[in-house]
């Protein structure tokens, strides 16, 4: 595809920036956003960076009615020597197109969109917080915009990228969380949209999450939608268990999202010479491992939290305290290594980080 010039319109009124030590997750947004449109007769066109602003859309826009939308999530960091770094952004672009395919959304030019993302981050670089546990969250997403109430794929779309300075996703930070195994609701089934990053997957998880939070849990552990026996994900993260020295994560089966942090964790564990298995793992196996005293660690992995240790797991009437409710050695090492690579403090032996070039002109 021919690369299109990205036009830039800078804001005339900059917003006040939040205290980096008081950041929550996803409540504050930067001065600018990236936008690109699609029409069936034109393809993707008019890539632009403009001041952050509301959208004006027809009430019949198909995204409102049939949920034809996909999104991604990644982060930008400032290194100690003031370089802006992204973590494996090309994988997010690749996965966005995989989600597009599942949702009948036209493929994007991954290099074009990544270039727009980099330029946007460079323009709003001053919004990247540098306090411990903070980052600039990047949310690319695509919505169906055609005003039509028929059930079909839209002929027009809008791609946007917005930025948000964030603190830790969970108030616990790297401290272990309590999770409940979900036995009533299911997240996804094979052949559905579980392996796509689309809004409906998250909307359908809210009820189970609400019930869990009312009982004092941070997240739910999802089981498969057929037998309600095999472990799939934890909340919006992939899940790992360390059982008798073996680190196990559910194999990708069409209903589990292929996490970029998950892939990075597997690569690191193998690099460290540890035994890693991607396979089916039943909740009964985890319960039995706990009874046998060989359930050593459990942790979730994802862009938002990076690594989230599980300190307590509740299944029916059983409460499993994992590693005495403390962060495990592997989880801590993974967290320190990945966040270190992301911020340029740990050598990047895998070539995972991408530097965002500084603007040649002052904003």
From Swiss-Prot:
Its cofactor is pyridoxal 5'-phosphate. GO terms for molecular function: L-isoleucine-2-oxoglutarate transaminase activity; L-leucine-2-oxoglutarate transaminase activity; L-valine-2-oxoglutarate transaminase activity. Pathway: Amino-acid biosynthesis; L-isoleucine biosynthesis; L-isoleucine from 2-oxobutanoate: step 4/4; Amino-acid biosynthesis; L-leucine biosynthesis; L-leucine from 3-methyl-2-oxobutanoate: step 4/4; Amino-acid biosynthesis; L-valine biosynthesis; L-valine from pyruvate: step 4/4. Keywords: Amino-acid biosynthesis, Aminotransferase, Branched-chain amino acid biosynthesis, Pyridoxal phosphate, Transferase. Its EC number is 2.6.1.42. One of its GO terms (biological process) is isoleucine biosynthetic process. It holds the Pfam family Aminotran_4. It is an enzyme of class 2 (transferase). The modification N6-(pyridoxal phosphate)lysine is found at residue 197. Inhibited by canaline. CDD domains: BCAT_beta_family (cd01557). InterPro entries: Aminotrans_IV, Aminotrans_IV_CS, Aminotransferase-like, B_amino_transII, BCAT-like_C, BCAT-like_N, BCAT_family. It comes from the Bacteria. The keyword Membrane does not apply. Transaminates branched-chain amino acids and ketoglutarate. NCBIfam families: ilvE_II, PRK13357.1. This is Branched-chain-amino-acid aminotransferase 2. It comes from Bacillus subtilis (strain 168). The lineage of its organism: Bacteria, Bacillati, Bacillota, Bacilli, Bacillales.
């Amino acid at each position: 595809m021919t690369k299109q010039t990205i036009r830039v319109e800078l804001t005339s009124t900059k917003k006040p920036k939040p205290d980096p030590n008081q950041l929550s997750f996803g409540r504050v947004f930067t001065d600018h956003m990236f936008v690109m449109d699609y029409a069936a007769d034109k393809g993707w066109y008019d890539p632009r960076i403009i001041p952050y602003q509301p959208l004006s859309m027809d009430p019949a826009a198909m995204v409102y009615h049939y949920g034809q939308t996909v999104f991604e999530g990644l982060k930008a960091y400032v290194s100690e020597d003031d370089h802006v770094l992204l973590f494996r952004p090309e994988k997010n672009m690749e996965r966005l197109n995989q989600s597009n395919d599942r949702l009948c959304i036209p493929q994007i030019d991954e290099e074009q969109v990544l270039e727009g993302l980099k330029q946007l981050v460079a323009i709003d670089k001053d919004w990247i917080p540098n306090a411990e546990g903070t980052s600039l969250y990047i949310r690319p997403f695509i919505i169906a915009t055609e005003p039509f109430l028929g059930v079909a794929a839209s002929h027009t779309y809008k791609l946007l990228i917005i930025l948000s300075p964030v603190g830790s996703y969970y108030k616990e930070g790297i401290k272990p969380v309590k999770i409940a195994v979900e036995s009533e609701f299911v997240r996804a089934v094979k052949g559905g949209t579980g392996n796509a990053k689309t809004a409906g997957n998250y909307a359908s998880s809210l009820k189970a999450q609400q019930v869990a939070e009312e009982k004092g849990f941070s997240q739910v552990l999802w089981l498969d939608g057929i037998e309600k026996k095999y472990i799939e994900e934890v909340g919006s993260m992939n899940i790992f268990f360390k059982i008798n020295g073996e680190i196990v994560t559910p194999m990708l089966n069409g209903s589990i999202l292929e996490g970029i942090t998950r892939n990075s964790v597997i690569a690191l564990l193998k690099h460290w010479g540890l035994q890693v298995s991607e396979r089916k793992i039943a909740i009964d196996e985890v319960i039995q491992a706990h009874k046998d005293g060989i359930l050593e660690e459990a942790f979730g992995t994802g862009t938002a939290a990076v690594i989230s240790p599980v300190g307590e797991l509740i299944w029916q009437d059983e409460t499993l305290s994992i590693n005495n409710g403390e962060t495990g050695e592997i989880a801590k090492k993974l967290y320190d290594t990945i966040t270190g690579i992301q911020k340029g403090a740990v050598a990047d032996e895998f070539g995972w980080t991408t530097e965002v070039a500084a603007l040649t002109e002052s904003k």
